[in-house]
Structure formats: structure tokens, C-alpha cells
């Protein structure tokens, strides 16, 4: 499943729409987990979620936490609840308890040069598939001028 959650803007109708959409996504994700548990197919939900899961997922936590969309506790709670319900955050599982790895950097300032990024692009795997994740790569450009997007591709290799 390819997913895009718009970024929202704190205290605006856009953010209200985002917050109304997250429970609907959670309902579908619960259906996919149940399907795998019943012997059905495994699933992968991946894409730009526009939300960090924790302090490890953003270089500048303190100035952003609960001040900007994507770093609000109520958004973070949804992503973490999906993990509690059984989804595997493949990159975090493979990377371990480290800062980053980031997949998005603002075009403004020196964010890319200073690696002041956010980890907001995910691969959430159902449990059986998540156990088969073997490696990951973030396709970060070597130089600012080589960037084709403010995001870098996130790849995970699964042994199937």
C-alpha cells in the first residue's frame, strides 16, 4: 500500500483534516494485520507519513516538538500505536536505537548540508513480513545540488 499523509499546519483546518484521517488509516491497517494473522497475505504500508515517531527521528526535536505539524504528540501517538498493534517499522527495527536515519531535509537554510533532517518516510510491515526485513538504504544525494526532491528514497530488502 502506498501512502501519503499531508503535512498539515498546526492549529489549522489542514491539521484538523489530517487528524480526522489518521484514525481511518488505523482502521485499514488493523484490517491488514488481521488478514495476515488469519493466514492471509502479508502487507507493507510505505510512503511519506509526514510525522516523526520519536526524538530519534528529527535532528532538532526541542524547537519543533508540539510546535509544528509532524512533531505533535497526537500525531506521533498514531504511528506508535500501529507499532503496538503489531506493525513493524522496518527501518527503525534494522537501524536500532540511533539518531535518524533521516529521509527528508528542508530546502531552506543548511538543513541538508548539516544533516538536520526528519525521518518521515516509512515502510510499515505486517509482523511476518517485518521479520524478513534484512537491510535498508536511504538514497541520500551526496551533494545539495544533486537532490531531485526534499525526500530521499527509502529502500528495504526483504527475504521472501
Describe the predicted segments one by one:
Residues 1-160:
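Active-site regions of metal-assisted phosphoester/phosphodiester hydrolases
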Amino acid at each position: 500500500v502506498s501512502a501519503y499523509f499531508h503535512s498539515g499546519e498546526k492549529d489549522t483546518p489542514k491539521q484538523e483534516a489530517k487528524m480526522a484521517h489518521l484514525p481511518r488509516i488505523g482502521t485499514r491497517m488493523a484490517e491488514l494485520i488481521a488478514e495476515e494473522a488469519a493466514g492471509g497475505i502479508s502487507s507493507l504500508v510505505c510512503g511519506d507519513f509526514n510525522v516523526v515517531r520519536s526524538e530519534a527521528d528529527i535532528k532538532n526535536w526541542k524547537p519543533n516538538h508540539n510546535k509544528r505539524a509532524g512533531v505533535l504528540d497526537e500525531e506521533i501517538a498514531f504511528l506508535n500505536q500501529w507499532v503496538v498493534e503489531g506493525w513493524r517499522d522496518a527501518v527503525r527495527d534494522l537501524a536500532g536505537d540511533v539518531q535518524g536515519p533521516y529521509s527528508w531535509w528542508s530546502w531552506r537554510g543548511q538543513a541538508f548540508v548539516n544533516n538536520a533532517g526528519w525521518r518521515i518516510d516509512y515502510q510499515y510491515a505486517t509482523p511476518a513480513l517485518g521479520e524478513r526485513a534484512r537491510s535498508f538504504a536511504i538514497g541520500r544525494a551526496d551533494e545539495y545540488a544533486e537532490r531531485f526532491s526534499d525526500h530521499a528514497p527509502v529502500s528495504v530488502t526483504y527475504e521472501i
